């Protein structure tokens, strides 16, 4: 996939995650660790504007100078920023303006990639920006789910996924591994998280890993079997958290 195609794919995927949201859903901040959906859309756009368009596109026109303060996160070298716990108090810019902001930056980025995408430093920064946005896609979904979990009617993020799949999970088996010194971390040009680089050696103790993921049906069995009340099923720190927070079920389903 070309760099231009990768850019378009990642940017459109972010928007697709928001397609079931109403305008009112975009601005809610349900706790300090949650960012409103509109902030994610703006911040990932600001990243491309700040670290690619401004240094590499001399004729680029900044969409709004105030966005630099509003949508910086923790990039202290880039300047000051609006406090994270107060992001939900920003009723302006409105949602439609942030979508225009994304269009503005996408158009400029497309031109930049076509004209300078073969420069190693530009290609590297575009890749970094795409990985950054893909990380925010996960955060975006996590934050939307938390916002909806606070509503007494428990709205679904994607109502189309409410029907259970017409299949059963294969038997879960565990494969034992002896452990040892392994080289871990990202390699190649694919997606990775920030903490997956640089690639390095580390000691891994002997372990066993399941052949598949846990299903929500199995998790329901754990709840019904008093899994949250049985200390033998938890590590000491986990059990302390269960007791301290009064957990008896997942935060949302």
Please identify what each model-predicted range represents.
Residues 2, 6, 15-21, 25, ...:
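Extended beta-strand/loop cores of jelly-roll/beta-sandwich
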């Amino acid at each position: 996939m070309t760099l231009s195609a990768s850019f378009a794919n990642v940017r459109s995927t972010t928007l697709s995650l928001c397609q079931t949201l109403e305008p009112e859903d975009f601005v809610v901040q349900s706790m300090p660790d949650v960012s409103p959906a509109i902030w994610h859309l703006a911040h990932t756009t600001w990243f491309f504007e700040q670290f690619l368009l401004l240094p590499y596109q001399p004729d680029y026109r900044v969409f709004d100078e105030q966005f630099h303060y509003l949508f910086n996160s923790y990039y202290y070298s880039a300047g000051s920023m609006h406090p994270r716990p107060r992001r939900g108090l920003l009723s302006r810019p409105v949602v439609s303006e942030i979508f225009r902001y994304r269009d503005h930056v996408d158009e400029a980025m497309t031109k930049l990639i076509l004209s300078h995408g073969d420069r190693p430093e530009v290609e590297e920064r575009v890749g970094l920006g795409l990985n950054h946005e893909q990380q925010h896609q996960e955060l975006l979904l996590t934050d939307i789910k938390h916002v909806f979990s606070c509503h007494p009617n428990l709205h679904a993020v994607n109502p189309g996924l409410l029907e259970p799949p017409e299949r059963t999970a294969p038997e879960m088996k565990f494969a034992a591994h002896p452990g040892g010194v392994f080289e871990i971390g990202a390699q190649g040009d694919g997606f990775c998280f920030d903490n997956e680089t640089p690639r390095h050696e580390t000691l891994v103790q002997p372990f066993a890993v399941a052949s598949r993921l846990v299903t929500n049906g199995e998790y329901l069995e754990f709840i019904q079997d008093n899994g949250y009340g049985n200390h033998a099923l938890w590590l000491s720190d986990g059990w302390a958290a269960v007791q301290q927070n009064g957990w008896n079920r997942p935060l949302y389903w």
